Amino acid sequence: RPCPSQTHSLYRRALARPTETPTMLKIENLHARIGDKEILKGLSLDVKPGQVHAIMGPNGAGKSTLGNVLAGRDGYEVTEGSVQFDGVDLLEQDPEARAAAGLFLAFQYPVEIPGVNNTYFLRAALNAQRKARGEEELDSMQFLKLVRQKLAVLHLKDELLHRGVNEGFSGGEKKRNEIFQLAVLEPKLAILDETDSGLDIDALKSVADGVNALRGADRSFLVITHYQRLLDYIKPDVVHVLADGRIVKSGGPELALELEAHGYDFLKDRVVPEAAV
């Protein structure tokens, strides 16, 4: 048995030891397919709270499939591997439960919902999630106060509340509206699937400003993109290169610049053909 002085020394060392930040999202050896076509082929990834991870790669690498599988969209079958989100088995949950747990997917092509205005849609979505978590639903006044706070943070106008969901919106307006939805729903993990697709530079900056305004110690982002230009405005902590359904290289923001300079050809010697496995 240690003497009191030894016990005190052990206690002080334990206090001095840095506490490791828990992992928010842990993906291990994830395999997924659509029909007979396997798309994800052993993908592993760890994301900690507050981090921004960029997922880059050539067309057909599996970037959007990763986001869709995490969100639980129909048509994808997970055949192997595991996904833990805040210590819970994400793959066992339906899409609504995943959203209530704090996962948000911003679509590459946001859909229009004619005749349903943003206020009604967002209040219904938010209260459904609050109810699923056992929280009290917001009444009209509480909700209006919340959305006006979020509009101010994102420098958006009140008129957005009265428009139909993405109805008649330009590409940039649709993407800004999704960032507004993200702000109101306050997820723990936001997956942005090629948010920069089809945007001119002004719209891109506007969307990036919105994302940066929502960054925080408790919110993580997976930024899925084909091009480096989005990462000029949303600075990632980690950049991953996805090719043939696997992450083949990870690094800091400089990796995105390397891809911009040399393209994806340098990956060819890193991707092992299935026939050779």
Report each predicted region and the residues it spans.
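Conserved structural motif at the start of ABC-family nucleotide-binding domains
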Residues: L25-I27, L40
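The feature captures the beta-strand-to-loop junction immediately N-terminal to the Walker
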Residues: M56-P58
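ABC ATPase NBD Q-loop/coupling interface
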Residues: S82-R98, N166
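ABC-family P-loop ATPase nucleotide-binding domains
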Residues: V111-K188
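Walker B catalytic motif
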Residues: I191-T195, D202
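Helical segment within the ABC ATPase nucleotide-binding domain
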Residues: L204-A217
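Conserved beta-strand-loop-alpha-helix hinge in the C-terminal portion
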Residues: V238, L242, R246-D269
